[in-house]
Amino acid sequence: IPGLSEKYTGEELYLMTTEKAAKTADICLSKLQEYFDALIAAISELEVRVPASETILRGRNVLDQIKEMLKHLQEKIRQTFVTLQEADFAGKLNRLKQVVQKTFQKAGNMVRSLQSKNFEDIKVQMQQLYKDAMASDYAHKLRSLAENVKKYISQIKNFSQKTLQKLSENLQQLVLYIKALREEYFDPTTLGWSVKYYEVEDKVLGLLKNLMDTLVIWYNEYAKDLSDLVTRLTDQVRELVENYRQEYYDLITDVEGKGRQKVMELSSAAQEKIRYWSAVAKRKINEHNRQVKAKLQEIYGQLSDSQEKLINVAKMLIDLTVEKYSTFMKYIFELLRWFEQATADSIKPYIAVREGELRIDVPFDWEYINQMPQKSREALRNKVELTRALIQQGVEQGTRKWEEMQAFIDEQLATEQLSFQQIVENIQKRMKT
């Protein structure tokens, strides 16, 4: 093999190839599971109700189904490669070699015995030999092997179709789930990061769709090639048997001692067929291994790029959110500062603004939130004293002067900056004017 210093037999190369393919497939499936976990870990705890229905999409259930499916597929692939690695090719080749040797030995003995028999006896014996060969255990085993191979291929095909169909259904459900989350929780007015999210979402969904299409195409090609190979091998075996039959009839008419030459020709033809079948099988295995490795490397690279882009977009969204929050808090603080400056003259005695604190001193007795505020007891006491002073000075209740003086007293008490004596003096001045 180019690039390798040592020489390997066909069986060793087969074992090395299957072991490498098994490890690569195992690593690929493990990485796929890790990337899926990292991709949807943020939404695994969310629940989305489908509009106009009572259906609830739970991310946890979708994740569990995908994980179970990947584990089952991984176990099936591992068991398949273990079964292929445990195949006893050396024993089977030895048994085939023994069968061929016995066959040629019997053919040689038969050729030697033909010299003492006439044409009719030889013809009857050859017909009986052909019937015995077709009814022998080896012929039954060969037919049984072909039927079993076709049966196994059909089972593998049905299982793969069901698995791919289930994976496609789960993928479509995941796509609907992600779109429902986006429509419910993402604000479409925030154009900057929503566009980035749409791009990442389209790339991830496109990657998953390409993965499914690649698996379906690869499966169809592999199943078709394997089925064609089995059919071709079966036809070649049948053709070989028919050729042997014709050669046996040729040996019947051989009266010049050319039987040994015919036997050698048949042996060479059988060995050539065996070498051809081995070369075809090795070439198919190497070709499919290269295709699988190339596809897995391509998928791994795309997943790595998508993960990096997703992480960068997530970081950018987090930074943008923090920045927007800081801007909003600064706006609130500036609004309070402006409010303080605009109302400094009128409400400054009641409001105090500090960093992170807003204090309002209400000049009323307000014990409960569900009650209207009442004036303080001191303000009520001052109001009673001032009203009594008005009565003593001869101001009659219900008159216009009484109403004007009551309004003036309320204005004086509302300022909360004048003492009781100052208010009395102001009332006396007002009475004189």
Curated annotation (Swiss-Prot):
Pfam families: ApoB100_C. Keywords: Cholesterol metabolism, Chylomicron, Cytoplasm, Glycoprotein, Heparin-binding, LDL, Lipid droplet, Lipid metabolism, Lipid transport, Secreted, Steroid metabolism, Sterol metabolism, Transport, VLDL. GO terms for cellular component: chylomicron; cytoplasm; lipid droplet; low-density lipoprotein particle; very-low-density lipoprotein particle. Induction: Within 24 hours after estradiol administration, APOB mRNA is increased five- to seven-fold in liver but is unchanged in intestine and kidney. InterPro entries: ApoB100_C (IPR022176), Apolipoprotein_B (IPR052418). Glycans are attached at N158. It is found in: Cytoplasm; Secreted; Lipid droplet. The gene is APOB. The lineage of its organism: Eukaryota, Metazoa, Chordata, Craniata, Vertebrata. One of its GO terms (molecular function) is heparin binding. Apolipoprotein B is a major protein constituent of chylomicrons, VLDL and LDL. It functions as a recognition signal for the cellular binding and internalization of LDL particles by the apoB/E receptor. It comes from the Eukaryota. This is Apolipoprotein B. One of its GO terms (biological process) is cholesterol metabolic process.
